[in-house]
């Protein structure tokens, strides 16, 4: 396994207490193979598993990419939510 590369982004709304943190971890592999795992945290409560895995590989000058959604079809949410949608989504998830 190669060197660890990590990124993190944070977003929140002025009128909401909800905070979302996205972080990605890269493990470059031999032959320029990169595995990316993305985690999402809501109000800094850690998730138990990655939400998606993306793999990029360069072989003979050709880039090959694949993305696996590890949450399934039912849990896919739009990436852009209005403050009202975000509040409703957070409330629904907290009441589950």
From Swiss-Prot:
A lipid is attached at residue 2 (N-myristoyl glycine). Pfam families: Gemini_C4. It is found in: Host cell membrane. One of its GO terms (biological process) is symbiont-mediated suppression of host innate immune response. Keywords: Host cell membrane, Host membrane, Host-virus interaction, Inhibition of host innate immune response by virus, Lipoprotein, Membrane, Myristate, Suppressor of RNA silencing, Viral immunoevasion. Residues 66-96 are annotated as: Disordered. It is a lipid-anchor. Its main location: host cell. GO terms for cellular component: host cell plasma membrane; membrane. InterPro entries: Gemini_C4. Residues 77-89 have a biased composition (Polar residues). Belongs to the geminiviridae protein AC4/C4 family. Pathogenicity determinant. May act as a suppressor of RNA-mediated gene silencing, also known as post-transcriptional gene silencing (PTGS), a mechanism of plant viral defense that limits the accumulation of viral RNAs. This is Protein C4.
């Amino acid at each position: 396994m190669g060197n660890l590369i990590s990124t993190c982004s944070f977003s929140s709304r002025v009128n909401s207490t909800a905070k979302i943190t996205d972080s990605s971890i890269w493990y470059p592999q031999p032959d320029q193979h990169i595995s990316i795992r993305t985690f999402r945290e809501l109000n800094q409560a850690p998730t138990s598993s990655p939400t998606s895995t993306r793999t990029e590989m360069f072989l003979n000058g050709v880039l090959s990419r694949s993305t696996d959604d590890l949450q399934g079809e039912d849990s896919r949410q739009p990436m852009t939510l209005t403050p009202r949608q975000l509040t409703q989504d957070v409330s629904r998830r907290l009441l589950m």
